[in-house]
Amino acid sequence: AEFGINIRLFYYIGSLLNNIQGEKYIDACFKEIGTHILQGTLDTIQFHKECKIQKEEHTVCLPLRVNWGGGWSDTPPYCNENGGTVLNAAISLNGDLPVKVTLRKLKEEKIVFDSRDMDTHGEFTEIKELQNCSDPYDPFALQKAALLVCGIIPKKGNDLKEILHRLGGGIFMSTEVVNVPKGSGLGTSSILAGACVKALFDSVGITYTQEDIYDHVLC
């Protein structure tokens, strides 16, 4: 109840003020939603201290999604308060699965993200940079969140080089959505998150169910 009251208060006050101060309240509303979702998932996450990279390279390709009914009822904060039911179907694009994530083991102890469709590239050697995944303007927020929810890195503390040394090497993650524009309504962001989670689990040998994928993607 406190969550629902807080987000509504922030939103209504921000709407009434309708100025720079109001924008701060609107931002606070969405930050509250993000924190509620993230913490609810992160609190149940297990940091996999014993896992090791088991594949030199691994690629996951997934289809797009089209909604037949119930769209947005599964979207926070509505689904947090009321639940949600959506009827959808998986589709290919000209016979291809356009959502693609490739993981490759690196000799160097670092994390590298490469987004081909967004033309962005980033390299990380400090764990704090990877543990901050709440910035909506960060082009790699999704990839960082995948590392956290899969338990590859912990929520707080630790040393990235020690973790990667134990894993057996660094990680290169390439993400791409081929020939599908952002905002298409075909579920590219959530499906890309699912591909990242699935690729990470497969690469380090973590067993999972389809329900595990769904729960981790919600984060």
Residue ranges with predicted function:
Residues 218-219:
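Acidic/histidine-rich catalytic neighborhood of metal-dependent amide-processing enzymes
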Residues 2-186, 198-211, 215:
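ATP-binding N-lobe of GHMP and related small-molecule kinases
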Residues 189:
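Short, conserved phosphate/pyrophosphate- and ester-handling motifs at nucleotide-, phospho-/glycolipid
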Residues 195:
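Active-site signature of alpha/beta-hydrolase-fold catalytic machinery across serine-
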